[in-house]
Amino acid sequence: MTAGAAYRELGESAWSWVMRQVREDDGPWLPVDVSEDEASPVPGKDRDSLYDGIAGLAPVLAEIDLQRSRTDVEQELADRVVRRLLAGAQVRVEPSLFDGLGGDVTALRLLAPGSEAVALGRLADLMTPAGWRTTREFEPGSDAPLTDVIMGTAGVVLAAVWAGGEHAEAIATTGGEALLGAADETDAGLDWGMVPGRQSRGPNYSHGTAGIAGALAVAGAAAHR
C-alpha cells in the first residue's frame, strides 16, 4: 500500500467514525465528547457552531468533494446541516466566526453557495460602528465587541470577504474601521487587546495582533484602500 493510499484509508476511517456520532434532535448535532459512560447525551448550546458543532462538518465535506463524490448519506447530512444553519442564521445574534454567524457564513458558502447571503444579511443588520456585540460574556456583564479572529470582529471580516456578496464590502469597511478604532498605539506600532484597553495582550493569530492585522489587510483590499 502506498503512503497516499494509507492516508486515504485513515482519513476515510476517521470520517466514518464521525458520521456514526451524528445525532438527531430538531436537526443534526454532534456530541462534543464521546463517552461510553454517557448513555443519553444532549445537544450543547453551541451545537451549530464551526468550532464544536455541525458547521464544522462543512470543511470536511468540502474536502471530500475534492477527492471523490459524496455518498447519498453524506449528501443527506449536508442538506440537513444547511437547513438547520439557515433556520438559525435568521435569528442568531452571536456574530463570531467560531461560534456564530461567521461560522454560518463559512459552512453555508461551502455546502450551498448562495445560501450564505442569509447569514451575511444578518451580520449587516447587527453591525455597529464599534463592531459586533458579543454574547460570549468574555467580560462579565459586558457585550462589548471583541476584536480577535475566533470570537470577534476580525473573524467576521475574514468570513464575509471570503464569502463575497452584496454585504461583504460594507462588513469589511465597518469591521476594519472598528478594528482601527480599537487599536492602541505603541512605540512598536498598533496593538490590540481582545477588548479595547484590556491589559492582557497576545501577538498570535487566533486571539491577537497577527490575526487582526491580517483581517485589516483583507478588509483594506476588499474596500479598495
Label each PLM-derived region with a short phrase.
Residues 1-67, 71-77, 121-123, 173-184:
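Low-complexity, Ser/Thr/Pro/Gly-enriched N-terminal "stalk/linker" regions
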Residues 17-20, 24, 63-66, 87, ...:
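Positions within ordered alpha-helical repeat solenoids
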Residues 166-225:
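Extended ligand-binding clefts on enzyme/binding-domain cores
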Residues 108-174:
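Internal, well-ordered domain-core segments that constitute the primary functional module
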Residues 53, 74-85, 89-93, 97-104, ...:
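Generic hydrophobic, aliphatic-rich segments that mediate packing or membrane embedding
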Residues 21-43, 82-97, 126-147, 180-203:
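Glycine- and aromatic-rich loop/turn segments at beta-sheet edges
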Residues 3-7, 46, 70-74, 93, ...:
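Residue-level recognition of alpha-helical structural elements
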Residues 46-63, 95-110, 145-162, 201-218:
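Well-ordered alpha-helical segments within folded domains of soluble proteins
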